[in-house]
């Protein structure tokens, strides 16, 4: 068991969770998964002891090889975890039981630029898997994901081979989408001058990080776009 990708500590400080990805080797198997050993969620009791949560068999994509990417813990001790390459999400209680899991689905993107030609010309469309990277709880019932994408998968339910939806999503922990930015996140950055033209045909601005904060009584969501070298700020 190795290759930890993300660590979070419960708000009460009683335990930590680690997303152990066991990331695929892109130099073998044409970059495709499954590539065992599979990833797991490790839960470390701060007084001693560790529990491993089996995440196999959950996702539609490579169910034998879950690749957990990012974790966060809410005030109830519930962990939300992204399985990025598997395009899946799971919620686990503090006892290590899987409370819910669901596909991250895909997004119909319209008015995007998919051509590396030195100009921003948003006239294209694409159906893309979300493949979320970072995740953060907004409250005990909702969390947000930054849908970077990290996997090339041909012919999956009509989606583009490259994952990543160029935006971010707010979810209810029951799997319901509460808010979807679609292409508007990338559009706002491009119109502000943050457009990575070399990434147009791939994953665009690549939203990779997301966090929340409260300032003067207002809750905000911050979404980092790796390739655009920018951060979007939203009123939660």
Model-derived regions, located:
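Surface-exposed loop and turn segments in beta-propeller and other repeat-based domains
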Residues: 1, 47-66, 100-126, 174-202
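Residue-level detector of Asp-centered blade-edge/turn motifs that repeat once per structural unit
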Residues: 9-13, 73-76, 138-140, 214-218
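Short, conserved, GDST-rich strand-edge loop motifs in beta-rich repeat architectures
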Residues: 18-39, 145-166
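Structural signal for beta-propeller blades
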Residues: 25-26, 41, 87-90, 152-153, ...
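Beta-propeller blade signature
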Residues: 34-47, 96, 161-174
